[in-house]
Structures are given as C-alpha cells and as structure tokens.
Amino acid sequence: NLSRPNSIRLREANRSNNEQYATSSLGTSFLIDGAPISSNANLQSLKNAWEPQVTARDFSIMGVDMRSLTTDDISQVEIVRGIPSVEYGDLTSGLIKIERKRGGKDLSLRLKADMGSKLFYLGKGWEWGKGWTLNTSLDYLYSNKDPRNTLEAYQRLSSSLRLGRKFQLRAYSLDWQMNADYGASLDGAKQDPETNGGYEDSFQSDYHRVALSNKLMLKRRGQQWLKAIELLGTSSYEWQDMKRIRYINLQQTTAAIREMRNNSESDAFLLPYSYRAEQNVEGRPLNIFLKANACLALPIKFVKDELLLGTDWALDKNLGRGQIFDYQRPLYPQHSLRPRPFSDIPAVHNLSLYAENTLSLKAGKNKFELLTGLRATHLFGLRPDFALSHEWTLDPRLNLAWTLPPLSIREKALTMRLSAGIGQHSKSPTIGQLFPDPSYIDLTELNYYHPNEALRRIHVRTYVVDNSNIALRLAHNLKTEVSADLDYDGYRLSCTIFREDMSSGFRQMPLYAPYHYKQYDTDGINSQTITEQPRLEDLPVSDKYELIGRSYTGNGSRTLKEGIEYTLSTKRIEPIHTRLTITGAWFRTTYQNSQEIMERPSTVISNQQIPYVGIYEDTDWSRNQLSNTNFTLDTDIPRLQLGVSLSAQCAWFSSTQRKALNPYPTAYMKIDGSIVSWQEDNQDDTLLRWLVRRNATANTQEYVTPFSMNLNFKVTKKLMQGRINIAMFCNKLWDYTPNYNDGGLVIRRYVDPYFGLETNIKL
C-alpha cells in the first residue's frame, strides 16, 4: 500500500502505529553508497490537523519514507538488525546499507504493473579507459490505492548519475566515486466537488530532493601498518511543500487571535461563519555529512589485529518559511497557532569520534574473533541551558565469535560458529523535537455578544511559552544477542536470540502550569441602551487562575523487544532443481511510558473543570506477540530458462494485551501550581476523588489471533539468452484464514489476492 508513508520497524510484533513509539523507525539508519539519509531537519507537519487524509501522511518524526527509495539500481542490501560497528551512529534500531550498481555496459529496461501501481525504469552503464565507469538511471512510479479513484494518488520520480574511477598504482589502489541524485514524491488526495457541495477539499504534499556525494577509498598493498583511508562528503537539499485547502462552516461565533509574539492583552476579531481556508507548509531541509577514517594493522605476532579510527560530522538545518496561512481565515479556527519560519530554528551539529579494534586469533582449528568499539557523540549549536550542550554520549559495543573445529559426518564437514554481542546505540533528537513551536495560550477575559456586530467585543490575554526542550537527551537502546550458525554440505541453519531495551525513546508529554487572567463581568450591561463596545475600565473584574496544559517532548517511552529469529536453507536438489528456504521468528514487544505523566480529568462540577491535575506513574502499557514462518520453494531449470517460486506464509499466532494500570496518582497539582503527594484518604474528597482513574483496570484481556496461511506464486521466463525476463506473480493465491471466536463474537477474516506482471530487458 503506497497511499501512506511506509516507515520501517525492525524486530517488532504487530508494529504500533502510535507516534509515541516512533523512535524505532526514526532510529533506523539508511545508507546509500555510504551516504546517510537524514530526516533530522524534516518539519513537514500541518499543525493542529485532525483529518485522517492529513495525519496519516505525516511522517515528520517517523524517519525515512521507504516509498521514496528506488530499488532497481541496487546491487546489494545489508540489513543489520543486531549490533553494528561503531563506525555507524545516530541510530537505535538498525542499519540498512544499500550499495548500487557500478560499471557494466548494459541498457536495462523494466516495466511492472500490478493492481495498485505502475513502474517504469531505464538504466545504462558505461566502462572505458583505465577504470572509468558511469551509470545513469531514471524511474517513474504511479500508485493509487483504488484504481477507480484518480483523486488520490502517489507518484515518484527519481534519477541518478554515478561516476567512478579506479587507480591501480604500485603501492596502493585508489577508488573514487561521485554520485548525483534527484528524487521527487508527489502525494495527495482531494474530494470531488460534486460530492462536497461544490466546495474544494484537497491535500497535497510535494517533495523534491537533490543530493551530491563524493567518496575516496585508498587501500595499501602488502604488509603495511596503514591499510586503508576513507573520505566521504555528502550534502542534500530538499524542497518540501504541503498545501491544505478546505471550506469552513462555523456553527457559532468564533474569535480569531491577532499576531502577538509576547505576553500581552488585545481584542480578538470575529471570523465569518463560512469561508475558504488555506494553509501551506514550506520546508527546505539542508543536510551535510563529512566522514574520515583510517584502518591500521597492528604488528602482533600470531594475531590479526586491526584498529579503525574515525570521525564524522553532520549538520541539519531547515531554511523554509514554515507554516503559512491567513490569520483572518485560519484553517483550524479552534486552535491557537502563529507562524514561525523554520529558518529561525538553529542548525544542529552532530560530531562523533570512534575507535574500534578487531582481533582475530587462530588456536589450532579454532578461530576466535573479538570486536570492541567506542563511539562518542556531542551536539553543537545548542544554547547553554540545554542539557545536551554539556554532554558527550558514549556508545560502547562488543561482538565476539568462536568458530569451532569442523566435524566430519559421513565424510562431509560440519562447521559451527557461535557469537554474542552487547552494545548501546543512541539517536539524537530532530531539530523539531529540540526546538518546537512556542505555545500560545489564549485566555478569554471578556466575551460580550450583542445582536449588533459593531457592539460585540472579545478581549484575550495571551501567554507565549518557549517550548524548547532543554532537558531532552538522546534516545538509548541497549542490545544483547546470542546466535549460532551451522553449515553442512550446503545446508545452512542460523538462529539468533535477542533482547533490546530502549527506555528513553522520544514521547510527546503534557505539562500543566497555572496561568493568571482577569474575568470581566458583563451582567450589568444594558444591551438596549449601549451605544459602543463595553470598556474594560467600566466593568467589574475578578482575578482567576487556570491550569493549562501544553505538550513537550521528553524521553518518556520504553520499547522492549525480545525474540528469536531463525533461517534454514537447503542446497538445490538437482533432480527437481529445487531449494527450500525456511525463515521465521517469534517476537514479543512491550510498549510503555517510562516517565510520570500528567492528566487532568475532564469532569465539570458547578460549571468548572476539576481544578487539579493528577501525576501518574503509568498511563500506557501493552504487549504484542507474533510468531510466523515462511516456507519458500525455489525452482530453477536452466535448460528451460524457467524459474518458479512458491512460498507459504504461516502466521502461527499473534496477540496483544494491555496491563492494568495503577488508578491512583502518586501526586497532584493544585490550582496554584504546587505539587502535593497523594494520600489514601484523598479518594474520599469531593473533588480529589475524580483523580482516581476509573477505567485503569479495564480491558486487560489478551486478544489472540489464531493460525492463518497465504500462498504466493511467481514464475519467471528468460528469453533471448537471458536478455529478456518476463515474470508474473500472484500473492495470496490461496489462503487459509478461518473464522474464530473472541469474547463471544465470531471474527470473520478474508484476504484479497494481489497479482502483477513485470518485464526486464537488457540490451
């Protein structure tokens, strides 16, 4: 489904769509030819939006949208779910390393069509002279979820130019690579005016990215202490534009707040009951990344010892104008919002230093490997009051492996490799999380209505609160894993047991504080004789306080991942030219808050909301489990130039369960802002008893989805000595999804088959 942003979640059961746990996808790093794709300056979010067609397309804190990645140029993909080298940082969950094709002389053409998308790709390679290569490519993708609905579609256009040169000299080899890339994504939806009363209702999000990178690799020959040097420089600039248009119909008199940048009082003006509203978001992210490292060979007898030393620096800045709208025609009239240029947000500099030692020792037929590393990270460009401005974050990582002596079974060798690792991984906050928009708290002091519009008056006190998250720190994920790999006569088995605990993920959290305002009494005004707007100095006034909440980003989310991953592959059985591959996993993922949360009950007594805010140790706890296995039969018949693949996707079970929360607060805030510890007898108080959460222990049943299975089929035929490949696929060709009972209800399941055709041509 390409109608919504597609973020990656590694090692998660029944992945949560809750943005409070988005650090898992934000903390997955993507490298293309060594250059990272940074989303730290992505601020494309339509503030105060509530419509699904808008919020479902917001991935400003979700990391990389994988829809924007083209796959046809890829020659190799490495997915590091475990503990990567300390050379790679600013990540918590995993690493995706993509290497693209280089060299060759073929002209490649690919055409693909399925039930939801159409793809065109054209690529060409050149080789000439002494080590020169050039690769170019162009691809276009069009997708809509429902082919009958052309008003909602996603489009992608990308092109790439990759130039390289290899120098072979007497003492060393030199590899230079230069990449220039362009990518565009157009995503939008709109309603047919004929079904919307003739009014326009549309959303459009456009994205254009230009990237340039240079990489230089020097490798020494022979027994030299300096083995290799790598230099990498990359930069990218993006044009991000978002537009939302809809027609507003108000049911009551609504005030619009004037533009005020500091604490002050002013009169508001009244909005018309109906109008056309438009709000734009203009983002211009700039990302620069520089990296240098050297690999040294240490002269130790009988031991292979290599030392990697390096540093990298990243800059993230947004030069856009931010939220753009008309104060007198706001898109969301019930919310307080003022525009702030993204360019006013400071640039953030991320500097890292790292060192890693790789030790390899052979003792008889045993081989031992030990990899130890340390990465240090510091953020520059922050004000002195930020906690991160004074901290260096250290990420130690360790991997060890033991390759046992081979065992002879029926005159064939069985090899076994045992490995284990532990390491910390850290992700820095985005600039939007460090420097969010200020909060504008508008408190109505006077609201006088008169049938004569000229006599109406609304007076507002505005507080402007700096929301800079000075206490925010990096998100840390501690990974531990143990794995075993066996290889016997072409049969391979691997199994990994892992545990990942990220207790400081980024989370939007409420923060309450008391705010003072005046309340003017208009009961004494004679609406029949008044000839001008009421004057404040002529009205009785009283002082009031109100507990108002605002949102801030804290390290308050915990994601605990546990599980087992396994893979079994057989060698190809020659009589039937078939190989069996079995992959599967069991995942258990726990989501919960890791810091105390403020909540104010919505109960109203005597026309006033409860004047207390509860402080609770837990507000969210859920545990998901999943177990699945994929069986793939892959048949390749060279004589017929025919390939057939049949896979069975078995979901043994999945479940979700919520935990009973503590209904009592640990403390509460009074109207004056003071914090008082909760006492047992508070639950008998007329007002304080409403702080006891009545539904905290409800709905703790575990919901289990039983076994289901889908069959997928693909056939590939080669023509003209393999220059033309034609493939047809059908996913969910057959399924087993029986009905099941859940809480006395019969749950009926069904799946829709999905098929398509693709052609690959090489000339």
Protein language model features and the residues they cover:
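Extracytoplasmic beta-strand/coil segments of soluble accessory domains associated
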Residues: N1-A49
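Gram-negative outer-membrane beta-barrel transporters
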Residues: D501, K518-N662
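N-terminal periplasmic accessory domains that precede
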Residues: N6-L10, F30-L31, G63-R67, E87-L111
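Transmembrane beta-barrel wall of Gram-negative outer-membrane proteins
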Residues: S108-Y142, N149-S236
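C-terminal beta-signal and adjacent terminal beta-strands/loops
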Residues: S426, M502-S504, P510, C650-R694, ...
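Face-selective signature of the C-terminal outer-membrane beta-barrel domain
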Residues: F167-G183, S205-D385, P406, G563-E565
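Short acidic/polar hinge/loop motifs at secondary-structure boundaries
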Residues: A35-V80
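Structural signature of Gram-negative outer-membrane beta-barrels, strongest in the C-terminal barrel
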Residues: P346-R492, T496-D501
